[in-house]
Amino acid sequence: MTCEDGGTDADTWYELHLRTQQRLGLPPFPARFFRTLLEALVPRGAARLLIAKSGGAPLAATILLNHRNDVIYGYAASTAEGQRRGAGDLVLFSALQSAIAGGRQTFDMGSDAPAQEGLLFFKKRWFAVQKPIPTYTLGADSAGVSDSSSPRYRLLRKGFEHMPRPMLRLAGEATKYFG
């Protein structure tokens, strides 16, 4: 298994993203969001795509966001096989090596929610320290609304989990809008 720079390969990234979101039972972001992000930020050094492959087949990838001395582990995706084989660990290890070599001072593992046990386990294996992110609302508290792991979304998540991938792609286009 190898890890390589993916440049602006939004198509490879998006296929992995679709597989991950389906496994999690979540709608994907629109493809144009990632295409725009990669095409705008990678050439400026403000983002980087890393892809783990085995025999030429992509197994996992991450999009890193760079700002000054900070790196944010912004988005991660994998195939089920990549998850079993630790491809996400290889990508994260490569990202950490790159951050250190680039003189970055902070590596932010990104946001999560208390109910995202698998994600929290993955991050804790890498000695990540969880810190609360302040949120502000006007009116009623929306903490439970913003957590996609909340039991209130269980039925909806099952629907996304069993949706054929072409329909999942369309659902992402319909449910999340990015100009």
Summary of predicted features, one role per range:
Residues W13, A87-V91, R104:
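Short amphipathic alpha-helical coupling segments at ligand-binding clamshell hinges
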Residues Q83-Q97:
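Conserved acetyl-CoA-binding loop-helix of GNAT-fold acetyltransferases
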Residues R104-Q105, M109-G179:
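Active-site/acyl-donor-binding loops of N-acyltransferases
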